[in-house]
From Swiss-Prot:
Signal peptide: 1-18
Organism listed in the record: Influenza A virus (strain A/Equine/Prague/1/1956 H7N7)
Keyword terms of this UniProt record: Clathrin- and caveolin-independent endocytosis of virus by host, Clathrin-mediated endocytosis of virus by host, Disulfide bond, Fusion of virus membrane with host endosomal membrane, Fusion of virus membrane with host membrane, Glycoprotein, Hemagglutinin, Host cell membrane, Host membrane, Host-virus interaction, Lipoprotein, Membrane, Palmitate, Signal, Transmembrane, Transmembrane helix, Viral attachment to host cell, Viral envelope protein, Viral penetration into host cytoplasm, Virion, Virus endocytosis by host, Virus entry into host cell
Covalent lipid sites (S-palmitoyl cysteine): 566, 569
Residues passing through the membrane, by range: 534-554
Protein name: Hemagglutinin
SUPFAM superfamilies according to UniProt: Influenza hemagglutinin (stalk) (SSF58064), Viral protein domain (SSF49818)
């Protein structure tokens, strides 16, 4: 039998690794989530809190001229009950009212009390001037057991005018005071409502009583209303205190025939101050500019969630407990399976029309900058940060928190001023209006932070895109984008070559000839990734068919020549 030996030759295929440079951005394993205008919970590399929640439970008074009123109520400083004797005149830029403080001794109330309290809180203290009133035919030493010093007395800054004798006639009187100062004068007087008609007659004589007060801007008449009332401090009578701010060179006139509590001294405000109501302890070892009932807020943040009634140089109160401001790029932690040179990429439009960042996975090892390169060549692999693009992004983000504070201050100061004008006309802003303002502030805060976050993410994405385009323009036809943030270079590119790409000094003409030759060789056999599997299977099938055909041909020739016999047994 003739024997033929068939030798099958096999071809060996090998892969030559191409030089490659990839672009990426910094990432961390655990970023911070922020909200933008279009999306909530976006993770960024860096973010800072804009809402202060830390309170110091003390009144920080270092560097302040502080007056602690203790048992004296603020309004008491202008009428002079016994508990306020030491505060009839004072200077301060921080006035602290305590819960135990009381404005009065003989029971009564102030007209437009909160507005007067607000004026006094801002007063900077009080100084007094005698109004020069003298009286004949009446007693000026009315006193009460409700206002005790060593014995029965009265308000230090007021005169309780009585008939010269019990049940005696009270004469009609007119008294005037001209403000000769260059600042407004605070004038306070009282109307006495006796506990009964009998008491009123005993104190001021019989007949109807009428008190009239006028100036160039004010005119009002008062009629006392005697009658029984619940006893307070042992008294069933009441004193209603009224007041006005008398302009310079203006004159106030009082006309009365009884039941009149006359002012003795006019009050003048010394300057400016902050007045707070708090039982927190004074602390002269810390400084503060923002105060509330629970203590001091010390913060450089634009917003706070501690107290809506804080006063001074304060962050604006918002309902949100946290509003994170992005100060870094969008973070996509590097997955273990993707800690290679290649990275998935995506492109989309940002809110403001710029191309948003397209590199999906960051590099956690890129710690020297926000953007950078990785490369591989015959000399190995390397990583380098791009400082120019990093600094460009940082420069645009630096000061973002301060700019946010400026925006909120400008916006909210306008709102404050508008409502201050309303308060002068109609009194205090009612609570529902205050709540509405807080709603507006809270919405504005959330909106402004979301806008800034959107801008930051678009900005940092744009810097990534600029860096990518810079590399693409340098390499031109000497490399090909692989769609994964990398460029496959068609020539040998050593470390100096890679450095020239990073430094924007790459000379594509120098490598053009080599790159074109290698591109032609690669393109001749390059398969599109979409059809690679199909062609490989087709090639395998065709090879098997060809091998089978050759084998059958050899068998047929051998049978024909008698070198092989086929016997079929049934």
């Amino acid at each position: 039998m003739n024997t033929q030996i068939l030798i099958l030759a096999t071809s060996a295929f090998f892969y030559v690794r191409a030089d490659k440079i990839c672009l990426g951005h910094h990432a961390v394993s655990n970023g911070t989530k922020v909200d933008t205008l279009t999306e909530k919970g976006i993770e960024v590399v860096n973010a800072t809190e804009t809402v202060e929640q830390t309170n110091i439970p003390k009144i920080c008074s270092k560097g302040k001229q502080t007056v602690d009123l203790g048992q004296c109520g603020l309004l008491g400083t202008v009428i002079g009950p016994p508990q306020c004797d030491q505060f009839l005149e004072f200077s301060a830029n921080l006035i602290v009212e305590r819960r135990e403080g009381n404005d009065i001794c003989y029971p009564g109330k102030f007209d437009n009390e909160e507005t007067l309290r607000k004026i006094l809180r801002k007063s900077g203290g009080i100084k007094k001037e005698n109004m020069g009133f003298t009286y004949t035919g009446v007693r000026t030493n009315g006193e009460t057991s409700a206002c005790r010093r060593s014995r029965s007395s009265f308000y230090a800054e007021m005169k309780w005018l009585l008939s010269s004798t019990d049940n005696g006639t009270f004469p009609q009187m007119t008294k005037s005071y001209k403000n000769t100062k260059k600042v407004p004068a605070l004038i306070i007087w009282g109307i006495h409502h006796s506990g009964s008609t009998t008491e009123q007659t005993r104190l001021y004589g019989s007949g109807n009583k009428l008190i009239t007060v006028w100036s160039s801007k004010y005119q009002q008449s008062f009629v006392p209303n005697p009658g029984p009332r619940p006893q307070m401090n042992g008294q069933s009578g009441r004193i209603d205190f009224h007041w006005l701010m008398l302009d310079p060179n203006d004159t106030v006139t009082f006309s009365f025939n009884g039941a009149f509590i006359a002012p003795d001294r006019a009050s003048f405000l010394r300057g400016k101050s902050l007045g707070i109501q708090s039982d927190a302890q004074l602390d002269n070892n810390c400084e503060g500019e923002c105060y509330h009932i629970g203590g001091t807020i010390i913060s450089n943040l634009p917003f706070q969630n501690i107290n809506s009634r804080a006063i001074g140089k304060c962050p604006r109160y918002v309902k949100q407990k946290s509003l994170m401001l992005a100060t870094g790029m969008k973070n996509v932690p590097e997955a273990p399976a993707h800690k290679q040179l290649t990275h998935h990429m995506r492109k989309k439009r940002g809110l403001f029309g710029a191309i948003a960042g397209f590199i999906e996975n960051g590099w956690e090892g890129l710690i020297d900058g926000w953007y950078g390169y990785k490369h591989q060549n015959a000399q190995g692999e390397g990583t380098a940060a791009d400082y120019k693009s990093t600094q460009s992004a940082i420069n645009q983000i630096t000061g973002k928190l301060n700019r946010l504070i400026e925006k909120t201050n400008q916006q909210f100061e306008l709102i404050d001023n508008e409502f201050n004008e309303i308060e002068k006309q109609i009194g205090n802003v009612i609570n529902w209006t205050r709540d509405s303002i807080i709603e507006v502030w809270s919405y504005n805060a959330e909106f402004l932070v979301a806008v800034e976050n959107q801008h930051t993410i678009d900005l940092t994405d744009s810097e990534m895109n600029k860096l990518y385009e810079k590399v693409r323009r340098q390499l031109r036809e000497n490399a090909e984008e692989d769609g994964n943030g990398c460029f496959e270079i068609f020539h040998q590119c050593d470390n100096d070559c890679m450095a020239s790409i990073r430094n924007n000094t790459y000379d594509h003409k120098k490598y053009r000839k080599e790159a074109i030759q290698n591109r032609i060789q690669i393109d001749a056999v390059k398969l599109s990734s979409g059809y690679k599997d199909i062609i490989l299977w087709f090639s395998f099938g065709a090879s098997c068919f060809l091998f089978l055909a050759i084998a059958m041909g050899l068998v047929f020739i051998c049978i024909k020549n008698g070198n092989m016999r086929c016997t079929i047994c049934i």
